[in-house]
C-alpha cells in the first residue's frame, strides 16, 4: 500500500475558489457596492416611477371626465394615496364608474390608481398638484426618500 502525503489537486482548487468568493464579497462590501441595498433602491425607484405613471393616467382620466376640472387636482391642497378611505372621506372619493359625476377628494386609494395594494417599498405617498411633485417615504429607511421628486 502506498502512503498518500500532501493534498490533492482537487482540494487545492476548491480552497482557491472559496478564497476568491470570500475576497469578492469583502471587496463589494468595502466599496459600498452592496447588491442587496442596490436592489432595494431599484425596487423603490421602480415603484415610484409606477406610481408617477399611474397618477398621471388617473389625472388625465379625471380631467377628461370632469369638464369643470373641479377635483383633487386643483392648485391647492394635496392628494394622499391610501389603502382604504376613512369614513369621513368616503363620499368624496371619485367614482370608478365611467360617466358619473366625480367629486373633489383629497384622498385616492391605491386600487383606484390600478394597484392591487400598496407597493411593498412605499410607506406613504402624497401628491401636490400645485407643484406636480410627490412626497414619498420608503418602508425601508435605508432607501433614499424621493421627497420632492
Language-model segments: which ranges?
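N-terminal leader/signal peptides at the extreme start of proteins
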Residues: 1-7
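N-terminal signal-anchor/signal peptide hydrophobic helix marking the start
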Residues: 7-16
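C-terminal juxtamembrane segment of a hydrophobic transmembrane alpha-helix
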Residues: 19-40
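Membrane-proximal N-terminal amphipathic helix
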Residues: 36-66
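Periplasmic/extracellular, small/polar-rich flexible segments of pilin-like filament-forming proteins
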Residues: 56, 60-149
Amino acid at each position: 500500500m502506498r502512503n498518500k502525503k500532501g493534498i490533492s489537486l482537487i482540494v487545492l482548487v476548491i480552497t482557491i475558489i472559496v478564497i476568491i468568493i470570500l475576497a469578492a464579497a469583502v471587496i463589494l462590501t468595502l466599496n459600498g457596492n452592496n447588491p442587496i441595498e442596490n436592489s432595494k433602491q431599484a425596487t423603490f425607484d421602480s415603484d415610484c416611477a409606477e406610481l408617477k405613471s399611474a397618477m398621471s393616467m388617473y389625472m388625465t382620466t379625471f380631467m377628461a371626465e370632469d369638464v369643470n376640472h373641479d377635483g383633487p387636482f386643483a392648485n391647492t391642497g394635496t392628494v394622499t394615496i391610501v389603502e382604504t378611505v376613512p369614513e369621513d372621506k368616503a363620499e368624496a372619493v371619485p367614482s370608478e364608474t365611467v360617466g358619473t359625476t366625480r367629486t373633489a377628494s383629497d384622498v385616492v386609494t391605491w386600487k383606484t390608481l390600478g394597484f392591487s395594494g400598496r407597493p411593498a417599498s412605499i410607506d406613504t405617498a402624497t401628491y401636490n398638484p400645485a407643484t406636480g411633485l410627490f412626497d414619498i417615504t420608503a418602508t425601508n429607511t435605508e432607501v433614499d426618500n424621493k421627497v420632492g421628486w
